[in-house]
C-alpha cells in the first residue's frame, strides 16, 4: 500500500474513532440526564441507598425476592423507589389507596417489561392497550358469561377426579408428593376442554407434558431477563444461551397451541358443525375467535388469533395451578381449618360423586380459606403501569408522566398497615360482613383490566379444593418447605411438596 493510501486509511480510522467517541459521549450524556430526571421525579419516594450502576438489583438476587420486598413494605409507607440499575427505576406501590387511584386510570402496561413476553404469547389481551384492548375485551367477555361457566363445573370435576385417581395410586407407594406438576396438567386439561373444545385428556397426552415444561422454562427465563441489564437488548438476548433456550421453549408452546387451533378448525369444517355453533346462544372462547376470523375477515388476523390462544392457554391454566397448589399447601399447614372445610364439604356433597354450579355458593368457610390463601399467596404477585400523565396520590405525593409503577399485589396482601399480622393464616378476615378496603384484596388485579377469567378460576379452585379434601388428608413435608418466588406467577423454587393420606 502506498504512503498516500496509508495516510488516507489512517485519516478515515481517526474520523471513525472520533465519531464513535462522540456517539458514546452523547449516549452517556443522555443516560446522565435521564438519571437526573429520575432522581428528581422520585425524590418524594425514599428508598434504601442504591449503587449508581446496579441500583438495588443485588438486593433481589437472593434465593427469594420476597423477604427484601416485605422489609420495604414495613419501612416505607405506601410506596418506595426501586432502582433496577443506574438508569432504570420504578415506584413500588403496596397501599390500597394508591392502588385505587392508579387502577381507576387507563395508563398502559409498562412496555419495557411486558414487551419481553411478546415472543412467547404475542400481543393478546394481556399485552394490548388502548382501543384495541377495549375492543378485544368486549369481544371475549361473553365467553365468561355465567351460562357458559355453569356446565364447565362438571368438566372441571372430571379433570380433578382424573388427577386424584393418579394421586391415590402414587400415595399407596409413597405418601410424599410434589403437587405443582400434576395440578398444572389438571388445569391445562380443564382449560382445553372448557375454552378450546378439546376432546382428549391433557393429563395423559405426552405433548401436554412438553408444553407444561416449556411454560416453566419460559417463566424462569422471563424472570432472569427482567433482572439483567445486559439481556434487555434483543440482539444480545437472541445470541445468548438464555435467548436460544427461550426460542426453543416458545416454539414448543406455539406448536401446542397451533395443534389446538387446527383441530378445532377441522371440527368446525365438518358438515353441519359450523351451523350448530352459530345457533348457540353463547360461544366458548376459541369459537368466538374462530368465528370472528371467518366472518369478519381482517378484523382478526391469524397472528391475533394465535396470540389470544397463547395468552389464554397460559393464563387459563398456570395462574390457576399456582392458586390451587398454594391453597392446598396453606390448608395442609393448618389442619384445623382443613378439617373444618372438609366437614363443610361432606355436609354439602356427601360421598362427593357430583358437584354442581349451585354447590359453589354453599361452601362459605371453604371460600374464606381459599381467599385467605390467595391473600398470602397471590397467583399474580404484581402488575405494572407506565404513567401516561402526571398523578397525585391521596397523601399529596405526585409523579410525572413517564414513570413506571410496579403495583405489588404480594406487598399489598402482606402490608401490616392493611392486614394486621399479615403472615398469619386467618380465614375470619373474609367472614361475611367483615369490612376491608375495596382495593386491599386483589388476587385477580383490579380496575377495568382485572382478570377476565376470575370467576372461571375461582370456580375451578373451589371444585379442586372440595374434591381433594373429600379424598385426602393433607400435611406439609417439613423437609421440603416451598420457597416462594415471583416469575410472572407466584411459583416455588423447589416445588410444593405435601404428604397425603387417603381417607377411608
Swiss-Prot record:
One biological process term in Gene Ontology: lipid metabolic process
Keyword tRNA processing applies: no
Single Gene Ontology MF annotation: iron ion binding
Topology class, membrane: Multi-pass membrane protein
Residue numbers binding heme: 451
Names of required cofactors: heme
Domain of life the protein comes from: Eukaryota
Class of enzymatic activity (EC top level): oxidoreductase
Catalytic activity: an omega-methyl-long-chain fatty acid + reduced [NADPH--hemoprotein reductase] + O2 = an omega-hydroxy-long-chain fatty acid + oxidized [NADPH--hemoprotein reductase] + H2O + H(+)
E.C. code: 1.14.14.80
Transmembrane parts of this sequence: 6-26, 112-132
GO annotation, cellular component aspect: endoplasmic reticulum membrane
Name of the protein this chain belongs to: Cytochrome P450 4A24
Amino acid at each position: 500500500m502506498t504512503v498516500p493510501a496509508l495516510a488516507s486509511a489512517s485519516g478515515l480510522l481517526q474520523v471513525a474513532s472520533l465519531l464513535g467517541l462522540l456517539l458514546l459521549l452523547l449516549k452517556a450524556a443522555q443516560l446522565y440526564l435521564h438519571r437526573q430526571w429520575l432522581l428528581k421525579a422520585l425524590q418524594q419516594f425514599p428508598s434504601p441507598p442504591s449503587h449508581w450502576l446496579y441500583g438495588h438489583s443485588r438486593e433481589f438476587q437472593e434465593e427469594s425476592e420476597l423477604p427484601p420486598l416485605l422489609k420495604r413494605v414495613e419501612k416505607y409507607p405506601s410506596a418506595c423507589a426501586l432502582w433496577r440499575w443506574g438508569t432504570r427505576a420504578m415506584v413500588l406501590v403496596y397501599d390500597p389507596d394508591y392502588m385505587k387511584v392508579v387502577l381507576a386510570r387507563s395508563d398502559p402496561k409498562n412496555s419495557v417489561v411486558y414487551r419481553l413476553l411478546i415472543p412467547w404469547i404475542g400481543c393478546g389481551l394481556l399485552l394490548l392497550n388502548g382501543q384495541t384492548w377495549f375492543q378485544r375485551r368486549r369481544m371475549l367477555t361473553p365467553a365468561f358469561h355465567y351460562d357458559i361457566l355453569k356446565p364447565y363445573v362438571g368438566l372441571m370435576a372430571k379433570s380433578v377426579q382424573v388427577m386424584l385417581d393418579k394421586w391415590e395410586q402414587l400415595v399407596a407407594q409413597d405418601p410424599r408428593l410434589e403437587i405443582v406438576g400434576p395440578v398444572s396438567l389438571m388445569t391445562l386439561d380443564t382449560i382445553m376442554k372448557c375454552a378450546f373444545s378439546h376432546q382428549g385428556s391433557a393429563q395423559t397426552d405426552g405433548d401436554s407434558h412438553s408444553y407444561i415444561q416449556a411454560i416453566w422454562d419460559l417463566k424462569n427465563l422471563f424472570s432472569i431477563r427482567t433482572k439483567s441489564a445486559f439481556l434487555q437488548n434483543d440482539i444480545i438476548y437472541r445470541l445468548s444461551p438464555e435467548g436460544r433456550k427461550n426460542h426453543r421453549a416458545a416454539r414448543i408452546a406455539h406448536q401446542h397451541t397451533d395443534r389446538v387451533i387446527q383441530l378445532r378448525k377441522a371440527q368446525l369444517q365438518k358438515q353441519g358443525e359450523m351451523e350448530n355453533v352459530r345457533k348457540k346462544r353463547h360461544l366458548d372462547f376459541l369459537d368466538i375467535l374462530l368465528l370472528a376470523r371467518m366472518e369478519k375477515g381482517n378484523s382478526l388476523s391469524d397472528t391475533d388469533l394465535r396470540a389470544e390462544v397463547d395468552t389464554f392457554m397460559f393464563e387459563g391454566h398456570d395462574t390457576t395451578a399456582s392458586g390451587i397448589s398454594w391453597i392446598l399447601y396453606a390448608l395442609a399447614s393448618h389442619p384445623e381449618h382443613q378439617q373444618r372445610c372438609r366437614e363443610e364439604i361432606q355436609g354439602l356433597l356427601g360421598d362427593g360423586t357430583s358437584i354442581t354450579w349451585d354447590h359453589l355458593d354453599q361452601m362459605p368457610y371453604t371460600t374464606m380459606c381459599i381467599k385467605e390463601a390467595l391473600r398470602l399467596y397471590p397467583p399474580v404477585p404484581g402488575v405494572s403501569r407506565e404513567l401516561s400523565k402526571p398523578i397525585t396520590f391521596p397523601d399529596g405525593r405526585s409523579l410525572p408522566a413517564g414513570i413506571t409503577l410496579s403495583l405489588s399485589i404480594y406487598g399489598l396482601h402482606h402490608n401490616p398497615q392493611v392486614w394486621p399480622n399479615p403472615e398469619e393464616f386467618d380465614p375470619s378476615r373474609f367472614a361475611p360482613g367483615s369490612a376491608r378496603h375495596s382495593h386491599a384484596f386483589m388476587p385477580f388485579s383490579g380496575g377495568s383490566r382485572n382478570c377476565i377469567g376470575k370467576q372461571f378460576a375461582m370456580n375451578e379452585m373451589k371444585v379442586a379444593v372440595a374434591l381433594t379434601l373429600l379424598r385426602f388428608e393433607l400435611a406439609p413435608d417439613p423437609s421440603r418447605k416451598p420457597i416462594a418466588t415471583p416469575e410472572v406467577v407466584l411459583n416455588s423454587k423447589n416445588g410444593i411438596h405435601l404428604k397425603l393420606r387417603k381417607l377411608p
